[in-house]
């Protein structure tokens, strides 16, 4: 039977994906591979899309039709007007007048490793995903990474408490995507209502250089932890 989408232990029935015939003509025409170098090498682009979409050429074509953010995309342009909320205590939120951080301030002029996950205090996220980056922070910094960022569809106060519990705030910057707009823009939103989580994020990781996505990995299921950990991204930098 299907596994629980976050813990991998309980039965879970995933909501059906849209069939290609249900896509709008505009969506079918979008090409997620935007940088000239990748676009000029269709086999490389297709391989990247296949990895992004689950491995098969058919899945890769479907990914392209749906307009997934992918290698070569500009992550800031893909989510215009979107800001994230840095993890902090309530008092810090009040003191900063509940300020948010524009994506350009996070990515422009920097080498960033960012990973997204379904939510704070959930199983794989707490036991494997965050620790993989915390434990490899020195190796990431040695490769010239300016910041390692964890983002989830949570408020910044929950993320702050979780980060402190994991003793990960010194290594990783945590940001909330309060209304899910960042993940919606990248087509990384998933409905996890069956796990009482509502609409959340897929489990994913990316290496972003000055806003341009250089490597992009998305798990097939939120309970998986095979391609989005620090060990994988280290080999892609």
Task: Show which residues each predicted segment covers.
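N-terminal chloroplast transit peptides
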Residues: 1, 5, 14-16, 20-23, ...
